[in-house]
Every structure is written in structure tokens, then in C-alpha cells.
């Protein structure tokens, strides 16, 4: 059976290194994009099972990336977990309009993140909290 792919989109390389170790230790394949442009390039090669998306990104911000993804039939159904230092209420409209699986405020507990990743993959992003 193929490993499920978790794609992190965040320009924080230290966070990426830490999450790579944690996510791979749980049996997932880990991919990393440092910005929205890299995300769109990766999506053209391999479709991930879940995307961990930061809102504050260089070049193309997380809001714009998410809107572009949702317009494309190939990517519209990928569950997205927002990882952001912004409070949930500040991205509330995005959360509802763009069908976000979960919102996790930074800093976060990796155990909680792993539970949300598992749930997002299992339910395909259809459950929201």
C-alpha cells in the first residue's frame, strides 16, 4: 500500500525539518513547499492526501493559493489544514468558504496535529471543527 502524502506549505524551514521527522515517524510520506508557487508546482507532479497550509507565505499568500486550488477540479477535494499564527476568527470567512478541514493556531502540539492529519485523510476534509 502506498504511503499517504502530507504536504507542508510553509516558509519556516525549521518547522519543516521538525514536522518531516514527526510525520515520517507516523508512516506518512512528507513533502515540503516553501511558498505557494512551489505548492502549485508540486501539485502538478503528485497529488497529496492532505495539505498543511500557512496563510502568511512569500510571493503568493495562503488565501490566494487556496482559492486557486479550489478552482481546479484536480485539487478541489484535497483536505487542507490551516497552520497559522493568526487567530481563527481572523480567517473565519476563508475557513467556511474554502472548506477547510481544520484550523490549527501556531504554536501547536504535534500530537494534536497528527490527530487532525489522520482525521482529514480519513474523512477527506468533510468534517470541520
Regions found by a protein language model. Give the residues of each.
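Residue-level signal for the "D+5" position in two-component response regulator receiver
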Residues: 32, 57-60
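Alpha4 helix (beta4-alpha4-beta5 surface) of REC/receiver domains from two-component response regulators
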Residues: 64, 86-104, 111, 115-118
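Charged docking surfaces used in two-component/phosphorelay signaling
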Residues: 17-25
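The feature encodes the CheY-like receiver
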Residues: 16, 58, 76, 88
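Short hydrophobic/Thr-rich beta-strand motif most characteristic of the beta2 strand and flanking loop
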Residues: 27-34, 42
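Acidic catalytic/metal-coordinating carboxylates
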Residues: 35, 61-67
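Active-site beta3 strand of CheY-like receiver
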Residues: 46-52, 57
Amino acid at each position: 500500500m502506498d504511503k499517504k502524502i502530507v504536504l507542508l506549505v510553509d516558509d519556516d524551514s525549521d518547522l519543516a525539518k521538525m514536522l518531516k521527522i514527526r510525520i515520517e515517524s507516523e508512516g506518512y510520506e512528507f513533502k515540503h513547499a516553501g511558498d505557494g508557487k512551489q505548492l502549485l508546482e508540486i501539485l502538478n507532479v503528485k497529488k497529496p492526501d492532505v495539505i498543511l497550509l500557512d496563510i502568511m507565505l512569500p510571493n503568493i499568500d495562503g488565501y490566494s493559493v487556496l482559492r486557486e486550488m479550489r478552482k481546479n477540479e484536480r485539487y478541489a477535494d484535497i483536505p487542507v489544514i490551516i497552520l497559522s499564527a493568526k487567530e481563527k476568527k481572523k480567517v473565519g470567512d476563508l475557513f467556511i468558504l474554502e472548506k477547510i478541514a481544520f484550523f490549527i493556531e501556531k504554536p501547536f502540539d504535534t500530537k494534536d496535529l497528527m490527530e487532525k492529519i489522520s482525521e482529514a485523510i480519513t474523512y477527506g476534509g468533510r468534517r470541520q471543527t
